[in-house]
Every structure is written in structure tokens, then in C-alpha cells.
Amino acid sequence: MENKGKLIVLEGACDGVGKSTQLELLESELSKDTECKRWHFPSYGFASSDMVRLFLKGKLGKLDEIPDEVIESYYAIDREYVWRNYLKKYYAEGKTILLDRYTTSSFIYQTLKCKTEDEKKDMIAKMKAYEYYNLGIGEPDLVIFFNGDFDTLTKLRLARENNAGIQKDIFEASVDTQRKIYESAQFVSEYLKWDTVNVTEGNAMRSKEDIHQDVMKLVRKLR
């Protein structure tokens, strides 16, 4: 597959870092002079994400009961279907694809049970080989990792969820699980050398405009 387009992924250290907002701002800015295609994974509303939806609701078993490779396959099926049917053609035409989550999320979540760094690295290598080479989906040209202080992000996220009455999924059930995800994200982002944007300052979120400026600096380097 000829690499003509650009594949930009926005990933976060945990929930509540503002990826969706930054994706909208990025699309708005880039659309001024280039064609963009935006997508959010998992692809809820598409049959390809049905297993993911059931898994996150706890319908397929408890988190510690399901092998990592099986969980990975739920997400990989969704990504492969969407890439083959919706994104591949845009990429081949030289357009910019903007993704909220991607294989990057699996690297973070599916290494949670790994006990050593070597096990984490081995798991990541297997997932990369499976999805990028066996399934043939696109490999990111740029991964922007939104990071911040865990306690600040958790406090703000819980306040939003309580006000909105949001139902938590299998990964969001406890702060302890969220902390493990956060710690996994720190390792993966450093190991894979993702470009980092900090979204907190002190005990508060930075403004979305300031964060957007940092994002644009990274994207301009790619272009």
C-alpha cells in the first residue's frame, strides 16, 4: 500500500484529557487547506464494534477472565473493517485522517496484565505485527499523546460524570483501574516515543486554545 496520506492519532493517558475537543479543533484548522477525514474508535453504531460494546458492558465476562489476545481481536476487527471500507481510500488519495483512539489504545490497555517491561514490549510487538502487517491497516504517521496530572484529571472527570449521570464501562469502574491504565500509558508513550502534549497545569486543565496551539506545532512539523 503506497503511503500517500497522513494518519494522525490522538491518544490519552486516561479518560477526560479532551481528545474529542482537540480533534474537532484540529479538523477545523486543517480543513482550511487540506481534505480531512475524522473517525472515532471504537466505531459505535457499526456492526464491527458489537463485540467491543458487549465486552465493555461486561457481557462477555470479567476483565481478568478474558485473555488479552481475545480482547485485542475485538478491537482489531473493528479497526480492520473501518480501514478497509472507509479510511483506506482516503489515505490512498493523499488525504489526512484524524483518529480519536486507534491501535495505540490497545497498546495501553492490553498490556495491563503484563508483569514486566519485556512482556509489555513483546505484547506491543505482536499487536503491531498483527494489525499493521497481517491485517494491513495503516500505521500512524504521528501520535499525539495527551498527558497530565492523574489526580487533577480524575477529579475533573468524576465531577463531569456525576453531573451528567454517565454510565461507566468495564475499564472505568474504579479509580484504581484508571490509575493502572494511566501508568501503562506512561510506559507505552515513552517506549514508542509518542509526541506529548500536557493538558493540565497545577490543579486545573489548560485552556483548549493553548492545548490546540501545542497540537498544531506538532502537526506542522509532520506536514
Predicted feature locations:
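Walker A (P-loop) phosphate-binding motif
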Residues: 2-28
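Catalytic metal- and UDP-sugar-binding loop of GT-A-like glycosyltransferases, i.e.
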Residues: 12, 146, 199
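A glycine- and Lys/Arg-enriched "phosphate-lid" helix/loop adjacent to the NTP-binding pocket
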Residues: 104-183
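Conserved beta-strand scaffold positions in the cores of enzyme catalytic domains, especially
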Residues: 7, 36-38, 143-145, 194-196
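NTP-dependent small-molecule kinase module
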Residues: 2, 27, 151-223
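Hydrophobic "anchor" residues on beta-strands that sit immediately upstream
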Residues: 7, 11, 96, 137, ...
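Short, flexible hinge/linker loops that cap or flank conserved catalytic cores
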Residues: 1-2, 137
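ATP-dependent small-molecule kinase phosphotransfer cores
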Residues: 34-129, 134-135
